[in-house]
Amino acid sequence: MSRIGNKVIVVPAGVTVDIKEGNFLTVKGPKGQLEKQLNSDLSITLEGNLLTVKRPNNEMFMRKIHGTTRALLFNMVHGVSEGFSKKLEIKGVGYRAQLQGNTLVLQLGFSHNIEMPLPEGISLDVPKNTEITVNGIDKAVVGQFAAEIRKHRKPEPYKGKGIRYVDEYVARKAGKTAK
């Protein structure tokens, strides 16, 4: 029994869900549109503003894919109605970020600047040169781009320098002590 898969998704006003043959879904909302091909063995139904996912049997694979499909559907509905965001902060002397057109430029203590073009469907806010907010309607793309930004200078445990998520805890280590 999939606890997540059995939950009903409430589709908010202003969001339309179109289910085509073979479980090809199109979700449109005020923030944009997402399309996804889901497993065709599952039955996805829209009754009023309630979206449900049902599986044909209790095989192990069907139980696994049931909850995953429901979570993907919920993320699509949530993304087009409210959107997703990830906040990162930069710590370190001389470390900064700036947005130049459609490119994020990072200065992270290397001999060169790191230039990252924005993927389609992603918008960035850089309120201060040490804060970055990644916004978008696709949760996977937002998380992936935030992880790629963080990858260039992960937080180190001694001084805490690097790029970290705002809610991330970095375990600190004590340095060497003199004898």
UniProtKB/Swiss-Prot annotation:
It comes from the Bacteria. SUPFAM superfamilies: Ribosomal protein L6. Keywords: Ribonucleoprotein, Ribosomal protein, RNA-binding, rRNA-binding. One of its GO terms (biological process) is cytoplasmic translation. One of its GO terms (molecular function) is structural constituent of ribosome. Disulfide bonds: none annotated. One of its GO terms (cellular component) is cytosolic large ribosomal subunit. It holds the Pfam family Ribosomal_L6. InterPro entries: Ribosomal_uL6-like (IPR000702), Ribosomal_uL6-like_a/b-dom_sf (IPR036789), Ribosomal_uL6_a/b-dom (IPR020040), Ribosomal_uL6_bac-type (IPR019906), Ribosomal_uL6_CS (IPR002358). Coiled coil: none annotated. Part of the 50S ribosomal subunit. This protein binds to the 23S rRNA, and is important in its secondary structure. It is located near the subunit interface in the base of the L7/L12 stalk, and near the tRNA binding site of the peptidyltransferase center. Belongs to the universal ribosomal protein uL6 family. PANTHER family: 60S/50S RIBOSOMAL PROTEIN L6/L9, LARGE RIBOSOMAL SUBUNIT PROTEIN UL6M. This is Large ribosomal subunit protein uL6. The gene is rplF.
